[in-house]
Amino acid sequence: MWTLVVNCGSSSLKFALLNPATGETPLTGLAERLGSDLAAVRVDRGEERGTVPLPQGSYSEAFGVLLAELDALGLRQEVRAVGHRVVHGGDRFNAPVRITPEVLEVIRTCIPLAPLHNPANLAGIEAALAAFPELPQVAVFDTAFHQSMPPVAYRYAVPTVWYTCYGVRRYGFHGISHAYVAEEAARLLARDLTDLSLVTAHLGNGCSVTAVQGGRSLDTSMGLTPLEGLVMGTRSGDVDPGLPDYLAREAGLTLAEITAALNRESGLLGLSGLTNDMRELEAAAAGGNTNAQLALEIFVYRLAKTIAGMATVLGRLDALVFTGGIGENSATVRAATLARLGLLGFQLDAAANAQAVRGQGGVITSGGVPALVVNTNEERMIARETARAVKGAPA
């Protein structure tokens, strides 16, 4: 069964045609700058690549290109379902669901929780429904994996009315990635996922750590929004909640300006004053740039502290999993993090760690608790979850 996976951003549309069982992917594409005169879609057909301009710059136009590509490959009639990444499902969804008018309405009610993402997700779903009206379509939520967290993990110590009336609680994100790498780690370790206690670290421009026990999320570092938790590429992570009030009084900044700075001008970029790219930071740090060195030290310090905290949540730790652009490719960050986590029993294999880059995963420890590098594949996880939802739901 071929499954079409769709991931819509505020000005982009990413798609992939996958076999959920094998991971075979004969077609991928990325439409960017939607809504502008420069909109175009890059298409990858394996050995062939091309770019198609989108004069209207719309989601529906991008889907038109997708349909033409499927026809060219002779696979349009072979697509059995469409899976959509949806960033926020609030507390209404703890698993992927077949898309219905009722599901669409719930996604709309979650727009205040994800004002940049959910509207784009809805636009993509509506375009896909128009392009593939005969196919089952499934919403796979980034927040659903974390709905297994207990109240002790997801409630904030704020007035209860904020929770009951406004949904103020911790939701967590990167759930699709955390779920995928947990499954893959169990496979690599030849262990039953239901018997494993894992800490998974998704480290990219956005970063989060999750405690996974028996395949279920017990706690995670992101919260109501993706701003909470670790130091990230341009996001601050945890700061004193009194910071906005202080900056409003002392610097005359508005709430919108402070929020924008915490999301787009902070993290590794803010600390270093150079870049949010870990590769460039590592090079600058190696060249003696003290700001870059400090940014790396703070990133690793906060990461190690959070991993140790998640291990405490689990009660025992069977393995630590690194994934995401930084987690999969920065041997420096992995080594520095494990060096701070000696009390958990990690014994780094320096050679294996150095080799685990550019798509080469595997175990990077020589003894004690295993640490692994697992290449995330959110598209394949969405395809898997879509196939499960279609198989398990009535037509």
From Swiss-Prot:
SUPFAM superfamilies: Actin-like ATPase domain. Pathway: Metabolic intermediate biosynthesis; acetyl-CoA biosynthesis; acetyl-CoA from acetate: step 1/2. Keywords: ATP-binding, Cytoplasm, Kinase, Magnesium, Metal-binding, Nucleotide-binding, Transferase. Mg(2+) binds at residues 7, 378. The active site is at 142 (proton donor/acceptor). GO terms for cellular component: cytosol. One of its GO terms (molecular function) is acetate kinase activity. It catalyses: acetate + ATP = acetyl phosphate + ADP. Mg(2+). Can also accept Mn(2+). One of its GO terms (biological process) is acetyl-CoA biosynthetic process. NCBIfam families: ackA. This is Acetate kinase.
